[in-house]
Design a protein with these regions (language model features):
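DNA polymerase processivity clamps
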Residues: 1-97, 113-153
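Charge-dense, extended regions
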Residues: 100-102
Length: 153
């Protein structure tokens, strides 16, 4: 039996990943990847947790909400069918989905992009504000461009 305790940072990253794609396939190890259904957003995170096996979650937001019901939750992997979420005297079984029915799973290997023309830092608060504005105005994409020394989103 393997036990995993998700850090706050990992939970925050997974919450962000759930806005990119509602489904996710976790691969054995410490790296988690997601890709949008339109394949225009790809994200990768390496956390301190090591997942003992591959498993798929169909609704990542629901999974994270379930974890939030527990005090100091621990994920216990004892079977390939489900994970036990335990905290205090409470526990719940969360069944994995078939990886074949997840909406879109990220490639297992790294994607090599050509060199960058523009580099910048974007805080998580700014990204959340942009995502909120995008949702309010029903805009599916954000565009980043640079013109005469001015960077614009």
């Amino acid at each position: 039996m393997s036990k995993v305790t998700l850090s706050k940072k990992t939970l925050d990253v997974l919450k962000n990943f759930s806005t990119i794609n509602s489904s996710i396939v976790f691969r054995k190890g410490s790296t988690v990847r997601t890709i949008s259904n339109a394949e225009n957003i790809l994200a990768k995170f390496t956390g301190e947790e090591i997942f003992p096996t591959d498993f798929a979650i169909y609704d990542l937001s629901q999974f994270l909400s379930g974890i939030s019901l527990f005090n100091d939750p621990q994920l216990e992997f004892t079977t390939s069918d489900f994970v036990n979420i335990k905290g205090g005297r409470q526990s719940a079984k969360y069944y994995f989905s078939d990886p074949e029915i997840t909406l879109k799973s990220a490639p297992e290997r790294n994607v090599n992009f050509p060199g960058s023309d523009l580099q910048f830092n974007l805080s998580s608060d700014d990204l959340l504000a942009l995502q909120k504005a995008s949702a309010i105005y029903s805009l599916p994409d954000l565009t980043f461009f640079s013109e005469e020394g001015s960077d614009t989103i």
